[in-house]
Amino acid sequence: MSQAYSSSQRVSSYRRTFGGAPGFSLGSPLSSPVFPRAGFGTKGSSSSMTSRVYQVSRTSGGAGGLGSLRSSRLGTTRAPSYGAGELLDFSLADAVNQEFLATRTNEKVELQELNDRFANYIEKVRFLEQQNAALAAEVNRLKGREPTRVAELYEEEMRELRRQVEVLTNQRARVDVERDNLIDDLQRLKAKLQEEIQLREEAENNLAAFRADVDAATLARIDLERRIESLNEEIAFLKKVHEEEIRELQAQLQEQQVQVEMDMSKPDLTAALRDIRAQYETIAAKNISEAEEWYKSKVSDLTQAANKNNDALRQAKQEMMEYRHQIQSYTCEIDALKGTNDSLMRQMRELEDRFASEANGYQDNIARLEEEIRHLKDEMARHLREYQDLLNVKMALDVEIATYRKLLEGEESRINLPIQTFSALNFRETSPEQRGSEVHTKKTVMIKTIETRDGEVVSEATQQQHEVL
């Protein structure tokens, strides 16, 4: 109780002597400031120091000076302030000065620790800014070159693949047309082959009929030759018989002539025999000429028939040879067309297999490129998220640095003001006009939030914060 009373008495004496401070109150001269620590390790301090809470308030006055820095001791009540026209107590001022020097020493130690922590904090901020700059450069590089280049390569390869697909489609259509044409030619040749086979069968049937006719004509010719031989033999026999009859008649005529000569009374028969001989010779010549003419006519008829049959046989043989040659040529053509068709079908199957394999390869390339694009998009999204996180951390650190700067500037102003007061022994109170003439600094912090999904920007928001330093 006595200590609280003495402290209150000292404060009252000090206020009676110096008056209230313009920007702060000395409710606890022995206390030391404790700054809020964010992101640093906590270091132990002396147990005799009490905590001091600082409240920074912005003023919207005409000059816009620094906010008043108020300090209040926890668990104590402020002593009532008195006017500035009271008398000076030098013994109390010396005691207060000694206590203030001790407090000043402790505050220097704490300020050194805070400076070390602040230096570490600045180093960490610089390191994070370097990482942020590197990540931003990487993001810009990926955003500016890699996706565009990958897209160009993808589009170029897709155009090449489409062109190859069109070429292969045209080749396949042309091969299909050629195959259809060859199938039509093959069907036409098969129909022509069937017609030629029918013509060959008809020719063979005609040839068989002609062979029967030739055989019949040959038999007729042989029969006629035999008849001619028999007629010739008959003619020769008749000639012999006629000659014998003539000889007999001549012999008889000679005998009769002898008898006539011997018997003069008998009539003359020479003229009669001559007439008979002439008649027989005429009849024989007529028969011979008729037989020869009939034989010649028959022989000529048979010869003509044989010639006709031979001509027909020769023509049939020629036609058969021609048909055989045509059949052989058509067979060779069919074999060649079959070979061409087989080769074209094999080429078509090879083209289809190659087209299928190339299409599979192109599909694999497309899938690989799409996977690379997705991977790059994921990487870009990850870098954007990291960049956004680092940007948020940087903004928070900037805000915290600004807060530390304001607290340090307020503490320096609070510390420097009593020193100037004690050194100059200037017991005049600072007027409100002088406090309002201090220059303030206004800082604007822009926080830009970008939300991405699968590498694409979904939403973008911008927030501005105004701070007065």
Curated annotation (Swiss-Prot):
Disruption phenotype: Mice hearts have reduced nebulette (NEB) and elevated actin levels, with intact myofibers showing disordered NEB organization. Residues 109-140 are annotated as: Coil 1A. GO terms for cellular component: cardiac myofibril; cell tip; cell-cell junction; contractile muscle fiber; cytoplasm; cytoskeleton; fascia adherens; intermediate filament. It is found in: Cytoplasm, Myofibril, Sarcomere, Z line; Cytoplasm; Cell membrane, Sarcolemma; Nucleus. The modification ADP-ribosylarginine is found at R58. The keyword Phosphoprotein applies. The modification Asymmetric dimethylarginine is found at R37. The modification Phosphothreonine is found at T17, T76, T77. The record marks D353 as: Stutter. SUPFAM superfamilies: Intermediate filament protein, coiled coil region. GO terms for molecular function: cytoskeletal protein binding; identical protein binding; structural constituent of cytoskeleton. Residues 252-267 are annotated as: Linker 12. It comes from the Eukaryota. Belongs to the intermediate filament family. This is Desmin. It comes from Mus musculus (Mouse).
